[in-house]
Amino acid sequence: MSRVKSGKVTHARHRKVIKAAKGYYAARSTNFRTATQAVDKANQYATRDRKARKRNFRALWIQRINAAVRLFDLEMTYSRFINGLAKAGIEVDRKVLADLAVHEPEAFNAIAARAKAALA
C-alpha cells in the first residue's frame, strides 16, 4: 500500500491561515502556529463585537431620542415618550425615531406631540 502524503493540502491550509493573518505584526503574520492563534483570537473578537455593535447602536438611538424628547418638552422623559407612543398606537422603531430626531426634527416633534396627547 502506498504512503499517503498531504503536502498540497497542508500547504493550502497554511496559506489560508497566513493570508487571513496578513497585516499582523511580526511572527503573527508569517509563522503558522502564532498566525493560527492570532486569527482564532481575531475571530473571537469579531464574533463578540458583532453582538456588542447591536447593543451599542440601540443605546445610541435611545440617547438621541431622549435628548430630542427633552428638547421638545422638559417634563417628558424617554420612558414616558415610549409609553405615549404605545398608547397612541404609533409603531415606529428606535432606529427610525433617532434618525427623525437628528434629520427631521419637525416630524419628530409631531410624533412627540401625539405621544404627549396620548398620555394626557
UniProtKB/Swiss-Prot annotation:
InterPro entries with a match to the protein in the record: Ribosomal_bL20, RIBOSOMAL_L20_CS, Ribosomal_protein_bL20_C
A Gene Ontology molecular function term of the record: rRNA binding
Positions of transmembrane segments: none
Record's GO cellular component terms: ribonucleoprotein complex; ribosome
Record keywords, A-Z: Ribonucleoprotein, Ribosomal protein, RNA-binding, rRNA-binding
Entry's Gene Ontology BP terms: ribosomal large subunit assembly; translation
Role: Binds directly to 23S ribosomal RNA and is necessary for the in vitro assembly process of the 50S ribosomal subunit. It is not involved in the protein synthesizing functions of that subunit.
Family, as annotated: Belongs to the bacterial ribosomal protein bL20 family.
Protein name: Large ribosomal subunit protein bL20
Organism: Cereibacter sphaeroides (strain ATCC 17025 / ATH 2.4.3)
Name of the gene this protein is made from: rplT
